[in-house]
Regions:
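Residue-level detector of transmembrane insertion/anchoring sites
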Residues: 9-12, 56
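N-terminal catalytic scaffold of extracellular/periplasmic and nuclease hydrolases
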Residues: 25-200, 204-221
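Generic secretory/membrane-interface signal
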Residues: 13-16, 60
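Bacterial N-terminal signal peptides that target proteins for export
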Residues: 1-10
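Intrinsically disordered, low-complexity segments enriched in glycine/proline and serine/threonine
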Residues: 6, 22-25
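C-terminal segment of classical bacterial N-terminal signal peptides
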Residues: 15-23
Length: 222
């Protein structure tokens, strides 16, 4: 199969929106598009995986592609010749992502909906529209005697991870969000943003407070 069929970009959209009376501009767009085109030389194989019969699910890993929409999924699907590991999902659904007070959500309200099952206001983290704290998947898991943790590639005070452990009406209240990790109860937390855990304006050292609760604090992978 010719690899060039999966060139991704805005070429078709841009050329389609141009009038036929502008051939020179259309050619320029086509030339520029080559600078913004991705070609996947070696697509990966996606084996078919089925859930074993007669066995219950023991562990759940919730993966959030922050900001990922159907457009991103479809682009990846197209680049890999119409195959993704997502195709092995036992159940696939869609959600309406608007928040309680806006048509377009943010990571605070959107992540809260995922973490707690309840919609809230724009910029709110782990609280309902009235500002009341909501129990997250972390909290509910611990109440059932299960282990629960968070591992992120961003800062821990970013709204998406904070939605699972923190409670605030402002996702930008970074020092307060970080302080909430002391009472989060998660067994395992990995992420960035160490500067907000120590040398804080309020004089607290969140690392020391976590250690006092029995956590082992590591500042490197070694």
């Amino acid at each position: 199969m010719n690899k060039h069929w999966i060139r991704l970009g805005m070429v078709a959209l841009l050329l389609g929106s141009m009038q036929i009376s502008q051939p020179m501009q259309a050619q320029e767009v086509a030339r520029e598009a080559k600078l913004h085109t991705y070609v996947m030389e070696n697509p990966y194989d996606v084996p078919e995986i089925k859930a074993p019969k007669g066995k219950k699910v023991k562990n759940v890993v919730l993966m959030i592609g922050d900001g990922m929409s159907l457009m991103h999924v479809y682009s990846a699907w197209t680049a890999n010749r119409g195959k993704l590991y997502l195709d092995n999902s036992q159940a696939v659904g869609l959600s309406k992502t608007y928040c309680a007070d806006k048509l377009i959500t943010d990571s605070g309200a959107g992540g809260t909906a995922i973490a707690t099952g309840q919609k809230t206001k724009y910029h709110y983290v782990g609280v309902d529209p009235q500002g009341n704290e909501l129990p997250s998947l972390i909290t509910l898991s611990k109440q059932k005697g299960m282990s629960a943790g968070i591992a992120v590639t961003c800062r821990l005070w970013d709204a998406t991870p904070a939605d699972f452990c923190c409670h605030n009406v402002d996702r930008d209240d970074e020092y307060d969000l970080v302080a909430d990790y002391v009472e989060c109860g998660a067994d395992y937390v990995v992420g960035g943003g160490a500067e907000k855990f120590e040398n804080r304006p309020d004089g607290r050292n969140i690392f020391q407070e976590l250690e006092a609760k029995g956590y082992q604090v590591a500042r490197s992978w070694e």
